[in-house]
UniProtKB/Swiss-Prot annotation:
It is an enzyme of class 4 (lyase). Produces dihydroxyacetone phosphate (DHAP or glycerone phosphate) and malonic semialdehyde (MSA or 3-oxopropanoate) from 6-phospho-5-dehydro-2-deoxy-D-gluconate (DKGP). It comes from the Bacteria. Dihydroxyacetone phosphate binds at G181, G209, A210, S211, N230, I231, N232, T233. It catalyses: 6-phospho-5-dehydro-2-deoxy-D-gluconate = 3-oxopropanoate + dihydroxyacetone phosphate. This is 6-phospho-5-dehydro-2-deoxy-D-gluconate aldolase. Its EC number is 4.1.2.29. Keywords: Lyase, Metal-binding, Phosphoprotein, Zinc. Belongs to the class II fructose-bisphosphate aldolase family. IolJ subfamily. Transmembrane segments: none annotated.
Amino acid sequence: MAFVTMKHLLAEAKREHYAVGQFNINGLQWTKAILQAAQKEQSPVIAAASDRLVDYLGGFKTISAMVGALMEEMAITVPVVLHLDHGSSAERCRQAIDAGFSSVMIDGSHHPIDENIAMTKEVADYAAKHGVSVEAEVGTVGGMEDGLVGGVRYADVAECERIVKETNIDALAAALGSVHGKYQGEPNLGFKEMEAISRMTDIPLVLHGASGIPQEQIKKAITLGHAKININTECMVAWTDETRRMFQKNGDLYEPRGYMTPGIEAVEETVRSKMREFGSAGKAVKQQVG
């Protein structure tokens, strides 16, 4: 089964008031866990490679081939998007598209809005020629993302409206108080701004840094137009905690399969739980029919 784009996937989710989870891949076994979770839950899924981890994972072509081969070997039948997360430049997005990624995020959020729009339009124009969906970001999601530390800067409503109108993107990540990594204290999303941005742009919104956000805030974000929710930290913590427990119980373990398997199983269970929480479980059949 070929990769699908986010365009119709997220439009359907927004219309039906649920969200599709993006789960970042951190290796082959990690990818298997995400795909297996999606198949068991009959949920569409977005498997993402962060730009900063692409080289670590073997490059764009390796990632595309690995995910595609796993889908075939595992007989995956649910819709799978292969997405570039936080693409750092138009060139990196082009490389991902040429390697077979079905979706890319161009992150120009650290630049002035005019430059952000120009970068995004360049990517969107190239992606449109290849049938690939595009996500952009306005404002700054704080915290740590693969070693990059930044502060929170709320998205401006007018800037969000501009980037959507001028670039023809498929999804918008509007920074509204979420952070990458672990939260210090209670997350506090900007729902007033969220409602205004959703109304003005009328496209699927993306919630970055969703690990650790309380379920009631997640549900409210979905009702206010979020159709894609990104999870990475919770999966990493689940894997690390379980792997650490394995070594605490048996410090003599040395076979990777022996000490990694419980952690991978924890990742799968975390992904399944999030799919149920986001309301995407059981939606694969409708997505395929639609």
